[in-house]
Amino acid sequence: MKKINLILILLIFSCSKNDTLVSQDNTQNIDPSPNGLNLIWSDEFDVDGTPSSTKWVFETVPPNNGSWWNNEEQYYTDRRENSIVENGVLKIIAKKENYEQKSYTSARMTTQDLFDFKFGEVHIKAKLPAGQGTWPALWMLGKNHATAGWPQCGEIDIMEHGDGNPGLVSSSVHLANSDGNHYYLRGEQIIENESSDFHIYKLKWSSSKMEFFVNDKRHHVFNVNNTMPFDQPFFLIFNVAMGGDFTNGNIDPNFLSATMEVDYVRVYQ
């Protein structure tokens, strides 16, 4: 898939408003390097098997008395049944099964302590899981979250899906106000074929603002100032949760499994 895109690029050179509908076209698969920026980190998922241990770590220990936050219902594992690279694509697989006193399993992968960065662009080409109750997310946390706590460390949600509308994807920025209380701002887009086609989810992050895109259609801009925690390094997180507050707690009773596929993730500065 990525090799075909490169060939297409070589051939070429040799010859916000919410609920904006993003249509599917052939150009969405071509993702050249942004002008003036250099690729500083990527995973093309070209080696089949377990995701690279030099780039990813698995979070498997629930932090909230045996559960994850937001009333989620999954147990995250590092098993190949829940995360694997096959045919050049990372697959994070949510499954209905009894495991460690939970009814669902999935995976949560991060680059914590392996890679973090401040400012630049993140490009992620992904196909989202289908099914009511799945909550896929491509997002980031501040490197200092262990000491500063959340939301003081800041959170950048490049893409979330599962808010009850099959085509709705959203991007959010979470932080604390002057009283230490959590608040967030969100932008949304309606896209077609989110679970059958790959789309490119993009963050542009500078010292003054963050911009969020799907297939180069911008749907959210967040202005940054020096009182906010977005002038420090952040690390990446990929996961598929089940149920939880974001999905209104509704899981299809006939759900068996669903997969988020990631063709690549690239970070530029």
Q: Where do the model's predicted regions map?
A:
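Sec-dependent signal peptide recognition
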Residues: 2-8
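C-terminal motif of bacterial Sec signal peptides marking the signal peptidase cleavage site
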Residues: 13-14
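GH16 jelly-roll
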Residues: 19-269
